[in-house]
Amino acid sequence: MASTSDFKNGLVLQIEGQLWTIIEFQHVKPGKGPAFVRTKLKNVLSGKVVDKTFNAGVKVETATVDRRDMTYLYHDGTDYIFMDGDTYDQISISEATVGDGARFMLENMAVQVATHEDVPLFVELPVTVELVVQHTDPGLQGDRSTGGTKPATLETGAEINVPLFINTGDKLKVDSRDGNYLGRVNS
């Protein structure tokens, strides 16, 4: 059980038999009336996002989520294969569970797999990943119709927008949560 004062991003709650993770939360103290906590929750299994308000001080059931360090090995049809670094056990996780982060995963990448009662819930990649640009068109200096960015295909097949000065073969830092370009890696 956790109180609303214990809320933090990433906390997994059990509400009506389903697991929800807190994406955003805000403590609100209105001029009139009691304080409350406004949250944005994401269903761990379906990915559905809902807004929910809790009265301040209310106790909410939390779920026990184990996070294990694992290594991404390879993609096999509709599943991704991961290996536990301690036990060398391999587990198979579906595309739906891996989610959007799959487009930034490289073989042998260290990730965290969150499980609840030995069922994989989601895969957390490092916040920043370093990937090589596989293909991008040359940026024309006078071309500003696109706001100074152009599409680039990364070595994983993901496509992101990058500044015009980025070339094929450059190594980039990318935010794995939203796919934003963060900078070039000096090599």
Swiss-Prot record:
Signal peptide: none
Primary localization: cytoplasm
Gene Ontology molecular functions: translation elongation factor activity
GO biological process assignments: peptide biosynthetic process
UniProt-annotated location(s): Cytoplasm
Pathway the protein acts in: Protein biosynthesis; polypeptide chain elongation
Natural source organism: Rhodococcus jostii (strain RHA1)
Functional description taken from the UniProt entry: Involved in peptide bond synthesis. Stimulates efficient translation and peptide-bond synthesis on native or reconstituted 70S ribosomes in vitro. Probably functions indirectly by altering the affinity of the ribosome for aminoacyl-tRNA, thus increasing their reactivity as acceptors for peptidyl transferase.
Claim: Cytoplasm is one of the keywords in the record: yes
Keyword Heme: no
Family: Belongs to the elongation factor P family.
PROSITE patterns: EFP
Entry keyword set: Cytoplasm, Elongation factor, Protein biosynthesis
Lineage: Bacteria, Bacillati, Actinomycetota, Actinomycetes, Mycobacteriales
Name listed for the protein in its UniProt record: Elongation factor P
GO CC, any one term: cytoplasm
